[in-house]
Amino acid sequence: GAASGSAVVGMALAMDTKSKTGSNYRRLQRFIKEINWTNTSLIQMILKWLKLDDGPYTLLIDRTNWEFGKKKINILMISVLYEGYSVPLGWSLLNKKGNSNQGDRWDLLNKIIDKVGAGKIKYIIGDREFGGVCWYNYLNDNGITFVIRIKENQKVYHDSQKISVKNIVKSNSRKGKHSNNKKYKYGKLEVYVSGFRFKNDKNKSEYLIILSQEKITDVIVVYGQRWQIESMFKNMKSNGFHMEDTHLQKDSRIETLIGLIALSYSWMLIKGLMIKKKNPEIFICKAHGRPSKSVFKAGLEFIMRALYTNNSRDFARAIKFLSCT
């Protein structure tokens, strides 16, 4: 919509020192200038805003490709779950095409661990790209429970016998279960294998198979939270911030923009949740019972309205949490 399409324009104006769009933008300018634009500082700030300082955290890891004008950017990102929504927490630009490697993930996750401590991280959830024996060992050594989807052709060991994970899931399915209580060996780790068969978009059978070193009763539900990071990417790319409409070329400036996006996304999500708690009825369409508006969109519209109308009261309410109090 118009409001969401103008979000990135609004942020650009807020950073433009020549802008004369009203006192609200100048107030936002001052706030932005005072931020220490380093990845680790933003991690701490976002967690404080979300009131998640003490954990435990459920982290989501994913990678996405964005185009900034003619420049293609490969971004590895870790987000944190907040009231069922994904909020960006750490990111890095990969100077290559394709998948991340285990070193890329170590470097990014270490930035978060350095700030919050591994002991506060309950889960890290990822899809098939984010496997690997060394990666699993690293997570396990840090006491972090991984919930990772693996490829159907992967093998594990049980009583010194090599077994296909696909066959394990097939066997469980015949018993009407998603998992069993058996421990399998994957590398040096003892792991649990869970999953189910489903029909993909092409109506072909496919298996969703999850590996974890802990027995998780509702592991399918836990893994299902991974989709929130994809929803977040969608909002950032088109539904909300239109990041791909910007024309930045320098990596340092793109990193700064992603930082600003992360802060803004947190801001809008928190405001949207506040609106939902106060007026839940506005999110329900009586005709079909589905939400008529997303929490993110509600927060975005409120903040953009406060910025553009120069409404001091609304703006004060919108930025209340920026002081971290």
Model-found features: residue ranges?
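Short acidic/histidine-centered micro-motifs embedded in hydrophobic/aromatic stretches
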Residues: 14, 31, 239
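Active-site-proximal, Lys/Arg-enriched surface segment
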Residues: 25-85
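Short, basic interhelical loop/turn and adjoining N-cap
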Residues: 14-27
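Single, function-defining residue in the core of a domain
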Residues: 1-8, 19, 42-44, 53-57, ...
